[in-house]
Amino acid sequence: KTYLYMLSRKQHLFYETAQIPKKDGSMRKLHAPVRSLKVVQKWILVEILEKVKVSPYAMAFVPGKNGLKENALLHKDRVFILEMDIHDFFGSITQRDVFHLFTKIGYNYTISAILANLCTYEGVLPQGAVTSPYIANLICYNLDMRLSALCNKRDIVYTRYADDLSFSSDNRTRLNRIERLLKEIVRDEGFEINDKKTRYFSNDRKKTVTGITINDREIHADRKLKQRIRSKIFHAVSEADYSEAAQIRGLIAFVDSIEDGYRDQMACYMEGLALKKELRRSAKVVRAYNENKLFRDLEDMIPL
């Protein structure tokens, strides 16, 4: 108990800060807990937080749910999609919010205060804490229910993937009319919409939901991502450089979770590379391929 109390009161001693580049070129601060605090947070996540149900509209960070795929499937049959983004999502959830969450779960004020301290840093949810995504989902329960109630009356599909809010309808006018009301609810729940990231999609242009492309009511992973994967595979095989093997496997698994059979496609692609004469003539390439197979079930490359 004394150790937990110390962890909760001296958070600044148990976090490491890193700068992570964002797509727009700016930097994001990532506060990651050191191992001792991370172990405690993992226990809180599994033994406390994940035993509380999130709203049915929360798609991300839910155990047993393929959130990205399920999210896209819910919107794929609609003609128009409105995507909105919550600004500074984790940073908008305060230590007080987390304290009240634990009291609602059933803990007394003292325990709730300790748990809130263990799960926050500098007064808000930290980007790098394992507990932050699920806490954010629980905090957003009221937001999800209010937005869904508004949308259900208008035959609009609503989902939330972390800080990405998705709304779809067969009627563009309904989405236009509801946008202001959506922002008011989001603001009333303590968040702000990042207007720069608000986007409309329709059937006359490529539709995307949380990064997944929808064409002809079918969902696909981003084409540029798949091109990048093939490029990485070719580089690994032809240059005998498997330093990014783990990343390649992870990217393939991600796309395969969206598009059934993608792993098999990439296995066939690698088997095709293994048959290329110009590659089989290099002892270095052959040896590296056979020693670093991206998939265990691939046949050996036969040297010439």
Residue positions per predicted region:
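TRNA-recognition modules of translation machinery and tRNA-sensing kinases, especially anticodon-binding
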Residues: 110
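Catalytic palm active-site di-aspartate
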Residues: 83-87, 128, 132, 154-169, ...
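Conserved helix-loop functional segments at active or binding sites
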Residues: 149, 153
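A short, basic-hydrophobic beta/loop patch
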Residues: 113
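Right-hand nucleic-acid polymerase module
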Residues: 1-21, 27-84, 89-104, 117-129, ...
